[in-house]
């Protein structure tokens, strides 16, 4: 006989039926051969409601019979100082030393 601890409890589904969408795989033509390739089009206000606003980058994970789309978090903007440092790192070693000497003078360290 089964003990009470080994009986699975009923849980709510992670995705509610109202949030389900039904699509049909269509096709797109590939130029210049005009071969048909499978295509899925997603559109609707529900995408924005789900966190997929226009311009959002999306990670796509593909498994057999399953595609998972995940909205990427926007990258924080790089500060002006970090942008300048990135530019300096592309300069020649001589120019980098000149920039370092300037920073040292401004900081009063040398």
UniProtKB/Swiss-Prot annotation:
Gene Ontology biological process terms, A to Z: RNA metabolic process
Keyword DNA damage: no
PROSITE patterns: SPOVT_ABRB
Keywords: Cytoplasm, DNA-binding, Endonuclease, Hydrolase, Nuclease, RNA-binding
Annotated InterPro entries: SpoVT-AbrB_dom, Toxin_SymE-like, TypeI_TA_SymE
Entry function: Involved in the degradation and recycling of damaged RNA. It is itself a target for degradation by the ATP-dependent protease Lon.
Name of the protein in its database record: Endoribonuclease SymE
Provenance organism: Salmonella paratyphi C (strain RKS4594)
Lineage: Bacteria, Pseudomonadati, Pseudomonadota, Gammaproteobacteria, Enterobacterales
Protein's gene: symE
